[in-house]
Amino acid sequence: MKKIILSLFFLITNVYSISAQNEAKKLLAIFAHPDDEQSVAPLLVKLVEEGVEVTLVIATDGRLGVNEYNDNKAGDGLAKIRRKEMMCAADILGVKLIHLDYHDQLKAAEGFDGHVPHAQKLILELKNIIDKVKPDAIITFGPDGKTTHMDHRLVGASVTQVFLSQRWGKPMKLYFHGMPSDLLGSQKVRTLRGQERSFLNVQIPFTWDQYDKAYQSLLCHESQYPAEVVMKMKEDKKSFGNRIYLRQFMSSKKVKNRLF
């Protein structure tokens, strides 16, 4: 009888282990504006092809995304255009899209009473999304915000705050997108948005077919990039190589009582 019970125990344990191994991993990619996903788009394509469940969260509506390529006016009309563009891009990438409706710059122009409640609401909503999706990993902006854009930096900081705010029910990793300083131009640009390579502890290769698909999705963002600009970006950025660079958030479990 004891042998039968032990056999059943090992059988159940083995089945559970295999089931856990075969369960699809979940990635949550969280960025500020429609088109920000392009920073890691080749990686998103790669992971979808590998069977990862990828959910892309875009925090803002893109209402302030005016530029020299068209005569769009900032406001509700542009936000509506950019929402459609984002749906097009997400469809090509093969990701599930959660597009929130926070204003660009999170109402910073309205001062403390306008901005802070808006920013706090975003943090709480991101917490609810993480609770619901239960990702194995999260990718967002690091402190550089790629371009030092205030929305990029604030969204990355908001995601980080949620990640740090509690012990989660499952193991979860947080990654910041980065760019090696030596791939950037002047010392000024390196200081503003680069990372020394030793800090970029995750470097994931992608194929040029995955790169092509990523740029196919960028064509959806017509209000931001005419086709000829997308094609030029595609060729220019090949010089960065076929890797996405990330920095995993790391913390020591050992509590110390000194700084040095």
Describe the role of every protein-language-model region.
Residues 18-169, 259:
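Active-site beta-strand->loop->alpha-helix modules in alpha/beta enzyme cores, enriched
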Residues 4-13:
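Sec-dependent N-terminal signal peptides
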Residues 13-15, 253:
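Prokaryotic Sec-type signal peptides and long signal-anchor helices
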Residues 11, 133, 162, 218-222:
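Alpha-helix boundary/capping residues
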Residues 166-260:
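The feature marks non-catalytic terminal segments
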